[in-house]
Regions:
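Compositionally biased, intrinsically disordered linkers/stalks adjacent to structured regions
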Residues: 12-19, 164-168, 254, 262, ...
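Extracellular, surface-exposed repeat/solenoid domains
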Residues: 1-28
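Outer membrane beta-barrel translocator domains of Type V secretion systems
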Residues: 27-214, 219, 225-227, 340-363
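A generic structural signal for short, non-catalytic loop/turn and secondary-structure boundary residues
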Residues: 7, 19, 65-67, 276
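Acidic, Ser/Thr-rich low-complexity linear motifs
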Residues: 225-237
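Beta-strand repeat scaffolds of extracellular/surface proteins
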Residues: 4-6, 202, 253
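Outer membrane beta-barrel transmembrane domains
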Residues: 112, 149-152, 237-365
Length: 365
């Protein structure tokens, strides 16, 4: 007789073998079962998403103009991690996938305090990510899908005379995840938290060109519910990571005043331009180095049998190079459209890499 498929228990697959003594034995395979890297990658996927969402909010849009504004943004992109030794060596499992979200953001208060411009507001977002995960040997482990809903708030301070600014963000996200392999469908829910402090100081190179050194610190945490699949229990420890981004923004600094409309159409005569070339436009590029450190997050698997528990702690530590570029145009007196695209490349460790594109509608009132 024979097993139709390997028997799974805890972190291992077992096969039925018959020895020379004619007795039958269950033996574990040399590698972990596919669900080990699959479930471990759930920690990384949620934290990658949370960081990308928080990073998609630009302080530039929140401080432009004197009026409160509402911004609607749509972003999509690719995210993943290279093979850096696999789960057996404590690295984040190799993965590749996509994400997308819609974010609505609005200013609540804009005022002047002690020579500083202060803006506060809130935002909400809904998104989805789907990532294919590979086993240590390069074979397919499965797919993790995540539906996420987020709420956040921000405080922006700008020193009126020097232009020095600071941007503080706090964000919470509810994650609903499903990890699917050939043998299991595992579901988990959890919460992600994030706090960010970003600062920059603009310098005018020419009348229309600006250089702005930037520095950002981000802390994030994650808590996923424990669960069980066909082979035993799955438990998650509290996850956390810290990130430092250092870079600069180089871009045009043109007057974005819309001026008088020039359209020949009567309904749009006072509010629209005759041609696209008349629209006020600014562009920017932003290269950065991002360092991830002090990452933590355990995933344990086992059964009721004593000694079966195995704990895995995939590291997200590493360094990546990031390049973002964007363009914004004022299409009405109170409406600005923006587009941006970016690419991140891991140069060491288990840092995330990928690319993204975003479109933003900004309306002042």
């Amino acid at each position: 007789f024979a097993l139709s498929r390997p028997l799974q228990a805890g972190a291992f697959n077992y096969t039925l073998n018959r020895d020379s003594d004619e007795d039958w034995y269950l033996r574990s395979e040399n590698t972990y079962r596919a669900e080990v890297p699959l479930y471990a990658s759930m920690l990384t996927q949620t934290m990658d998403y949370d960081r990308i969402l928080a990073g998609s909010r630009s302080h530039q849009t929140s401080v432009s103009g004197e009026n409160n504004s509402v911004r609607l943004s749509i972003q999509g992109g690719h995210l993943g991690h290279d093979n850096n030794g696999g789960i057996a060596r404590g690295a984040t499992p190799e993965s590749s996938g996509s994400y997308g979200f819609v974010r609505l953001e609005g200013d609540l208060l804009r005022t002047e305090v002690a020579g500083m411009s202060l803006t506060t507001g809130v935002y909400g977002a809904a998104g989805h990510s789907s990532v294919d995960v590979k086993d240590d040997d390069g074979s397919r482990a499965g797919t993790v899908r995540d539906d996420a809903g987020s709420l956040g708030g921000y405080l922006n301070l700008v020193h009126t005379s020097s232009g020095l600014w600071a941007d503080i963000v706090a964000q919470g996200t509810r994650h609903s995840m499903k990890a699917s392999s050939d043998n299991n469908d595992f579901r988990a829910r959890g919460w992600g938290w994030l706090g960010s402090l970003e600062t920059g100081l603009p310098f005018s190179i020419t009348d229309n060109l600006m250089l702005e050194p930037q520095l950002q610190y981000t802390w994030q945490g994650l808590s996923l519910d424990d669960g069980q699949d066909n082979a035993g229990y799955v438990k998650f420890g509290h996850g956390s990571a810290q990130h430092v981004r250092a870079g600069f923004r180089l871009g045009s600094h043109n007057d974005m005043t819309f001026g008088e409309g020039t359209s020949s159409r009567a309904p749009l005569r006072d509010s629209a331009k005759h041609s696209v070339s008349e629209l006020p436009v600014n562009w920017w590029v932003q290269p950065s180095v991002i360092r991830t450190f002090s990452s933590r997050g355990d995933m344990s698997m086992g059964t009721a049998a004593a000694g079966s528990n195995m704990t895995f702690s995939p590291s997200q530590n590493g360094t990546s190079l990031d390049l973002q570029a964007g363009l914004e145009a004022r299409v009405r007196e109170n409406i600005t459209l923006g587009v941006q695209a970016g690419y991140a490349h891991s140069v060491s460790g288990s840092s995330a890499e990928g690319y993204n594109g975003q479109a933003t509608l900004n309306m002042t009132f």
